Amino acid sequence: MSRKCELTGVGVLYGNNVSHSQRKTRRRFKPNLRSVKFTSDITAGEYRLSVNARCISSVEKAGGFDAYILKADDNVLSSNARAIKKKIIQTKTAKSL
């Protein structure tokens, strides 16, 4: 499993630990990933995604999982999230007809 958020694309960052004497040693900043089950109101399905903690509050702020994923850019979504977005769009258009 990659260390990357499936909805925002946030991944591992690299930097330095800097001591008091200004010695620099390389380190990795890992995202705070959580495996979360999101419920779609449109498809009435549950989807388990690996997202960072900040993304969870962003989804709530956007008005739910469906609203967030429909606004999200396809370039940052994982292939799994893109498939979910496609399914939501198809279901939404089928219900509107």
Swiss-Prot record:
GO terms for cellular component: ribonucleoprotein complex; ribosome. One of its GO terms (biological process) is translation. The keyword Ribonucleoprotein applies. It holds the Pfam family Ribosomal_L28. Coiled coil: none annotated. Keywords: Ribonucleoprotein, Ribosomal protein. GO terms for molecular function: structural constituent of ribosome. Belongs to the bacterial ribosomal protein bL28 family. NCBIfam families: L28. This is Large ribosomal subunit protein bL28. It comes from Rickettsia peacockii (strain Rustic).
